[in-house]
Amino acid sequence: LHCIGWSGSFIVSAILITLIIPLAWMLKAPMYQNPNTISTSQPALGFKQVLVIAKNHKPFWFLALGFFVCGFQVVFIGIHLPSYLIDHGFNATTGTVFLALVGLFNIVGTYTAGWLGGRYSKPHLLMWLYGLRGIAIIAFLILPLSIWTIYAFGIIMGLLWLSTVPLTNGIVANMFGIKYLTMLSGIVFFTHQVGSFFGGWLGGLNHDLTGNYNAIWIVSIALSAFAVLVHFWVDEEHVIHD
């Protein structure tokens, strides 16, 4: 930002995102199918039919509630932790390094979560992830605030940051099949974005009213406990078979 400013940073980000587009060609379905191949799959369900099935499947909504918690926590911390650090006498660079550590270790955490999800119960792994988030936040607030505790918190939160995504999408795929994954994971992700809105908005509102983030930290911890609880009722039972 000091070198090229906000507009330049956005331009660089746009260029990097554009470079991803050619990778979409690697995901193309085969253009031709052997005419002698006999399909044994079930007839595709309609959009409304799938929505009705999902609407009546309680574990799907428990999963969505858990993803709401994910959105609330990551956006609250991502937006407001740098301000929290400034309030406690640290400079802006400290917050920047914290976010960089989150981004770096998020790569490791997300990949590892996906690998573990192929070997162990995904709902149980999500219970562990949300529980560890709550413990990490409690430790961060209780321990004396220093550069080392800040950076350690950044590493831990990075490992837990979006590690929920492959597990959550994997559960949706197991429930309803990959044919309907994009639609139904989009609905679950919508709840994540609703949580993101409230995490960002309530954090700012609380700070404006009280001058601190104490209440939202408590809410984040309580939401971790809530997420652990709701995932107790999430299973990977096949609702729709491909």
Protein language model annotation of sequence segments:
Residues 1-5, 85-86, 116-117, 202-211:
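Interfacial helix-cap and linker-helix signal at transmembrane-aqueous boundaries
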Residues 16-20, 132-137, 157, 223-227:
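MFS 12-TM fold signature
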Residues 20-28, 221-242:
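Multi-pass alpha-helical transporter architecture, strongest
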Residues 28-49, 240-242:
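Flexible cytoplasmic inter-helical loops of multi-pass small-molecule transporters
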Residues 55-113, 199:
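Extracytoplasmic gate region of multi-pass secondary transporters
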Residues 102-105, 112, 119-171:
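C-terminal transmembrane helical hairpin of 12-TM major facilitator-type secondary transporters
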Residues 162, 175-210, 220:
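A late C-terminal transmembrane helix in Major Facilitator Superfamily
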